[in-house]
Amino acid sequence: MSQVNTSQGPVAQGRQRRLSSLSEFNDPFSNAEVYYGPPTDPRKQKQAKPAKINRTRTMSVFDNVSPFKKTGFGKLQQTRRGSEDDTYSSSQGNRRFFIEDVDKTLNELLAAEDTDKNYQITIEDTGPKVLKVGTANSYGYKHINIRGTYMLSNLLQELTIAKSFGRHQIFLDEARINENPVNRLSRLINTQFWNSLTRRVDLNNVGEIAKDTKIDTPGAKNPRIYVPYDCPEQYEFYVQASQMHPSLKLEVEYLPKKITAEYVKSVNDTPGLLALAMEEHFNPSTGEKTLIGYPYAVPGGRFNELYGWDSYMMALGLLEANKTDVARGMVEHFIFEINHYGKILNANRSYYLCRSQPPFLTEMALVVFKKLGGRSNPDAVDLLKRAFQASIKEYKTVWTASPRLDPETGLSRYHPNGLGIPPETESDHFDTVLLPYASKHGVTLDEFKQLYNDGKIKEPKLDEFFLHDRGVRESGHDTTYRFEGVCAYLATIDLNSLLYKYEIDIADFIKEFCDDKYEDPLDHSITTSAMWKEMAKIRQEKITKYMWDDESGFFFDYNTKIKHRTSYESATTFWALWAGLATKEQAQKMVEKALPKLEMLGGLAACTERSRGPISISRPIRQWDYPFGWAPHQILAWEGLRSYGYLTVTNRLAYRWLFMMTKAFVDYNGIVVEKYDVTRGTDPHRVEAEYGNQGADFKGAATEGFGWVNASYILGLKYMNSHARRALGACIPPISFFSSLRPQERNLYGL
């Protein structure tokens, strides 16, 4: 946006400025709720004030102004507005359009430009890339052209959003549809996407939140809530919600005190949402107290629950947008899950009760604590203490206990309990694995699934297959050839880096907030900060012994069953930097040797092509392998490299990732997806692996993006200076941007 000239002389500065047109008090970049709200409805404006909407003054009018009124404008360049010039530069982006009929314009736009009929306008569409729209000054009588994929796709998005607000006519600022893409994407993430992804349980929305699109069985047709056995207030709340909305057929059930793998399997056919933390609210109109859930964010797409490690990544982005209440709510929910379900769950559905996800609670609680005001806020201190108490319980009872702990190495593995076939996968996901067993027993595939789940057919090899499959899903990296058939036996660098971080964080917490003495309410044991630091030191030594490969510069996973270090080159090696467990020498070798193997056009690949191996019909591509890149890998690597003094490398990697996201956003109708192909410069969002790409299936306008990808964009921009931001806005590829830099500027990117 242009800068306002404030040095216009004493008369100009002292004179009260008169609002002469609508554009002077309407923000073209305001939230959709404001921009398309009732006050901006053209039909209402016509009734109240039928003339002179956003009248642009010509030079002839200005020349007739008295010398007194010209005071302070002497430094402004006077340019005449061309009567037929419809270029952006001629108007400086200040024009406004009048869309007399939103539906009609929307249909005309799609008919002319959406040639592949997917309700999006992209560079792959072959339309004329131009559309005439009416001017606001003439109330649509005169027309000008909107040109190009980016502006037309933004017009489609704005018309779609306006229609969703029930608008039939709109004024539309040119600046809104030709906004710098970096600014537009940032604005949408902070003001729209986070709001669309935020959930908060109340009496009126329980049924909608409880719906599950991942499972299609007779028992899953009705929404269902499972409540911990010791939460009677919540049980009564959900029963009340069910009674208030009988048409929803909401079912409410208590969970048993002891949750076993057998119990979890028994309710796979009747899955339900698991209750989360709630707080009391006082209703001033009724004088009654009621429960309401703490807010939380969901990843998006088919993932409509509170997820484990997604929530930490999203919390970082939410805090940047000052949505502290949502980030804080997710910490509350994790405390609740540990206290009532025994662990931070993969997600809050009944079929996830045996399965956790990568642990980030200590760091998550710390960043929320700081945002809440730290020690100066008693509520923040209370939250931190409860979060660390829960984290210590999780550390002891989940990650350093059987079956996840390997007693010989002292390292931990993704090794969840569970029985049967995971029900949340696509119905045919395991068919190729199960078909030989069905043939062996002379039954159909569906019959075999039922017999196996019921325990009437025993197949030890199949049991082991699903043990590792559940481990893969607990790791958050579902799926990858890195873990296939071995996950539960692997002491991974990612998990053990996180546990090292837990140990360091807990040591600091005990020293700072517990007078260096912590009594665990679980087992009444007493620990000090020195004891936790010693545990961290021991883990660090074991990680180096079993996982570090000096020659390659990678931390590799260690197979505890065959007692052998693997050689799968994964981006999770940089988690050792994020956790702070690597030595300076190890960090240097990682940057010199490991990084070049993983750094691609669009950032870090999940693994190297060599490690992934060949792809064929019988060996299909996996989404957590090369050539795909994921937001959490970028976020943790950026912070890890920065903390070890490699900020310039972080700048380079962040530019690559942000370029890829921005390019897809500009060329493909504002798309933001779960993962990207970091080797592709044209359509990196196009991922044909497993269940496709969440965030790509929308009509007209993307309203959610994808949780941790949204966060990665906002976090990545913190590493960009103004020069880099301008280059991103112009979609300049990394190779062109880096090669055009002066020598001193190249140093900023580790080149």
Curated annotation (Swiss-Prot):
Disruption phenotype: Increases cellular trehalase level during thermal stress. Increases sensitivity to heat shock. Decreases growth on the non-fermentable carbon source glycerol; simultaneous knockout of ATH1 exacerbates the effect. Residues 1-10 have a biased composition (Polar residues). Changing R686A: Decreases catalytic activity. The modification Phosphoserine is found at S20, S21, S23, S60, S66, S83. Its cofactor is Ca(2+). It holds the Pfam family Trehalase. Changing E690A: Severely decreases catalytic activity. The modification Phosphothreonine is found at T58. The modification N-acetylserine is found at S2. Its main location: cytoplasm. Changing T149A: Abolishes activity. Phosphorylated by protein kinase A (PKA); phosphorylation at Ser-60 and Ser-83 is required for activation by the 14-3-3 proteins BMH1 and BMH2. Coiled coil: none annotated. One of its GO terms (biological process) is trehalose catabolic process. Induction: Induced during thermal stress (at protein level). Induced by oxidative stress (hydrogen peroxide, sodium arsenite) (at protein level). Induced by copper stress (at protein level). Induced by protein synthesis inhibitor (cycloheximide). Present with 1840 molecules/cell in log phase SD medium. Hydrolyzes intracellular trehalose to glucose. The disaccharide trehalose serves as a storage carbohydrate that is mobilized during nutrient stress. Regulates the level of trehalose as a protectant for cell integrity during heat stress. This is Cytosolic neutral trehalase. It comes from Saccharomyces cerevisiae (strain ATCC 204508 / S288c) (Baker's yeast).
